[in-house]
Amino acid sequence: MEPVINFSNVTKEYPLYHHIGSGIKDLVFHPKRAFQLLKGRKYLAIEDISFTVAKGEAVALIGRNGAGKSTSLGLVAGVIKPTKGSVTTHGRVASMLELGGGFHPELTGRENIYLNATLLGLRRKEVQQRMERIIEFSELGEFIDEPIRVYSSGMLAKLGFSVISQVEPDILIIDEVLAVGDISFQAKCIKTIREFKKKGVTILFVSHNMSDVERICDRVVWIENHRLREIGSAERIIELYKQAMA
C-alpha cells in the first residue's frame, strides 16, 4: 500500500542572524564587515530524516524540546518547504500546529469558525450546518461571540480543536497545543482523535505525554538532535525513550 505521508531524506535549514540586534551599527556604518559576519550562518532544524505513514495509521513524533518535531509537522502540513529532500501527502490535510493558527484576533470566535473551517476545506453551507456542534464542543459559551484577542491559551485551543473535530480530513496533524487545555477537555480531544483513527484517518501527533502517545499511536518516530534516532512500535520506542530520559 502506498503511504499517505512520505518524508524522504528531509533536511530543513534556516538562516541564522548572529548578533543581529547588537550589529545594527555595523550594518549601517560597516556593511561589508556585518554581511561577512552574517553570511553562511544557518540553523539546522532537522537533518536527513525519512519515514512513511500508511493510511489509517497513527504515528507520534517524540523528542526533547527543539529536536525538530514541530518543524517536521510543519513540513508535512505544507506550511514550510524542505531545504533538501521531499515531503509528499495524499488527501486532505487538517492541521492544528499552533494556538491561534488560522484565526484573526479581531474576529469573534463564531466568525473565526467560519474562517478556519473554510481554510480546512469546508464550504460555508457545511460550516453553517455544523456550527452548533462546533460551539457545543468548544465549551466557550457566551465567549463564542467575543473577539478572540480576549481568549486565554486554553480557550484558543478549545476553539481550534472544536473546528478540527467537525472536518473530514484524510490526514490529521496535531502539535502539542492540547497541553494548554483543562484536563476534561484534553480527555475529550483524545477521545475524538481516537474516533478519527477508527474512521481510517491518518494521524501524525506530537506530544510529551507518553500516556497519550500509547493510547493513540501505532508507531513512534524518535527525533534526537535534529536527526532520526529510532522508529518502531509505540511500546518499544516509548520504553527506550523513557530509559534515555531517566
UniProtKB/Swiss-Prot annotation:
It is a peripheral membrane protein. Coiled coil: none annotated. GO terms for cellular component: plasma membrane. PROSITE patterns: ABC_TRANSPORTER_1 (PS00211), ABC_TRANSPORTER_2 (PS50893). The keyword Transport applies. It is found in: Cell inner membrane. Its main location: membrane. Residues 22-246 form the ABC transporter domain. CDD domains: ABC_KpsT_Wzt. It holds the Pfam family ABC_tran. ATP binds at G63, R64, N65, G66, A67, G68, K69, S70. Gene3D superfamilies: P-loop containing nucleotide triphosphate hydrolases. One of its GO terms (molecular function) is ATP binding. One of its GO terms (biological process) is polysaccharide transport. The keyword Cell membrane applies. Keywords: ATP-binding, Cell inner membrane, Cell membrane, Membrane, Nucleotide-binding, Polysaccharide transport, Sugar transport, Transport. May form an ATP-driven O-antigen export apparatus, in association with RfbA. Belongs to the ABC transporter superfamily. This is O-antigen export system ATP-binding protein RfbB. It comes from Klebsiella pneumoniae. The gene is rfbB.
